[in-house]
């Protein structure tokens, strides 16, 4: 990004920030909780950018003063040396701020701030694939806990020997999609299953879909398009059986999407959850269709959300996780314990690099 464009965008961001502050002081805004929350969130997003811009301006002023001091110190070798040291340090700070501000101004995915529905499906590998799906679920639950997000299972199909055939987690919090979107795809594990008596390594897979929560305005569902039935939910018997039909089986006829929800205590809650899941699935389809219309260069970027893309291999024997999009290895045990910051941070950095390259090509054109 050339300097004039950078400064122009920073000035626009600062103007927007001050405008948002004025709106927050408006009594009409204060009386509208939804609008107030939206404005406050956008102000919080812009605040670090505005602060960094102020730091950049201060560093630029200090650099000019250091240059003047250097020019005035040509007859004083010691003073000139000190002035040059200060200028060198300011140049480093200036470059770091320019890089940080440029990254902050890159095009944002408007969905990044959203909570998500995280769907994990067992793939190839039979019972071991179901166990692997359960391991992935625990990995995401631990990572979400580290990030301060709230995780709740909203739909689950448990396997006989443990784990899940399919599991959907609701992950709510700040900027959840901006980080978890990189998890969409096929996760392959190579390990000796607990059920393997010969000690042979098996390969199993699970597929992860990351669906940003959709607003009812974005995805409108006609009641006439729905088939809804209810059933009892619970365990194999005894006190675990729910004698009231609280489970909801929902079918969306136009898309063929079916959602079965049993996790909530009441039929109404399960119906609301089922509608949330359906809305997220329909929204994901809309996004997939939009992505398919974009250029191959865009689809090649990290984090496109393609659930068929083989993104990672988890090798237990070598205690190694390989992210195939990055061509990088990470230590397996910490990742499975939810310490995913390095992996996701590398994905974010790669996404930023791709955006910078695209921005550079646009500037050249």
Curated annotation (Swiss-Prot):
SMART domains: PCRF. The keyword Secreted does not apply. Keywords: Cytoplasm, Methylation, Protein biosynthesis. It is found in: Cytoplasm. The modification N5-methylglutamine is found at residue 239. GO terms for cellular component: cytoplasm. It comes from the Bacteria. One of its GO terms (molecular function) is translation release factor activity, codon specific. Methylated by PrmC. Methylation increases the termination efficiency of RF1. The keyword Zinc does not apply. InterPro entries: PCRF, Pep_chain_release_fac_I, Pep_chain_release_fac_I_sf, Prokaryotic/Mito_RF, RF-1. Residues 291-310 are annotated as: Disordered. It holds the Pfam family PCRF. Peptide chain release factor 1 directs the termination of translation in response to the peptide chain termination codons UAG and UAA. Belongs to the prokaryotic/mitochondrial release factor family. HAMAP family: Rel_fac_1 (MF_00093). This is Peptide chain release factor 1. It comes from Synechococcus sp. (strain WH7803). The gene is prfA.
